[in-house]
Amino acid sequence: VGAGGVEESLKKFFRAKAWALLHDPPHKMWVLYGTLKLTAGGHREDAVKVWEELGLREALGDPADSEEIVHAADDMASTSDRWITNFAFANVVRVFEYNKLHNIFDPKHQIDIRPLRRDELDEFLRDLAGELKPFAGDPRRVYHALYALYEVEWAARKLPPSLADTRAPTHTLFDHVYATALTLNLLWPDGKVGGYAVMVDIPGIQQVVGAARKAGDFWAGSWMISAVTWLTLWPFVWEFGADVLLKPSPRYNPYYHATLWAQLGGDHRLWSRFRELYSSLLPRPVGGMFEPQHAVRQPVIPGTACLVLPRVRPDGRELGRQQLEREVRERFEKACELLLALASGEQVSEEPYAAFFKLLSEKEGAQKPSARAVVKLFKIIKDAEPRAFEGLLRARVAVL
């Protein structure tokens, strides 16, 4: 594929994913009620208007080019709901108005959804457009920024979430559109079901944690598992988009937000949106001081992960099953190698890992845990638990 072809393939790929996120506008519920509209049409016309307001027509092109495959992903991401509700409401011709969000596991727990005001929507779109603008020249960067900021901006402002379907009030519009973006990977590039589910599992986790206890460093063992897992996943997340990450979810994920923030250049205005989100979720004073270098020091990534990947790369190259399994194993080995390099005091400048390691290398003070504790931990595991050490360096990988 020539340079021009690669550029067009990238734009086509990330245009489809961005349209998957925006095919239903964030205020869809109120469009259907007729109380808040950006156009004289329905919610599809408003979705196109949102696309334009965010500057994505200039950055990614016409969303109509992605309509067919996104429509298929939309159906697949919400099939069970639509089967049930379309049957139950078959004779209902008017819009079913409902303004409560219920806990899917215990529907007795519910919250009221207040009406969204026009000025709130306008301000949200204006500010989000300003945050996306610096990345408009790069399809991958603008999509990552959209994916990371879209829900975060809404939540940080404490705006009311639209229900995805008022007839099934157990999930929000954000739940649906983010699921649609993930589902698109199974249909890319021709709408036919395919793609891969990739399971990654780090063996010997209990031995690693046990060795950390023996070393008197409870943090190091858990953090090492988190860091190895994340560094195995990050190259795929950066190349294909965060929507490929099924477990752990990239939504409300401080590792993803911090690593992406550094990868996109480390703009402090950008991090302020994430800080606002976490300050509302974390107890004070932790939330108010939550910085990107804090995020990547928390051992919150599990030792088991799942990716959902398309059978064709963003640049148009085919991705075979055996090739993918080999790449995952190589990324895991690279993650272990780079962590040892960091712990030995070496600088890591290799892409796309450099941003993560730059965050780790920032000074935090003596009271903060240091990544160099990994050296001591590796030695203890190797001496006391040789089988665990050998297993740690050989992840279990399954590609389905």
Give names to the regions the model predicted.
Residues 1-400:
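Regulatory and interdomain segments flanking nucleotide-handling catalytic cores
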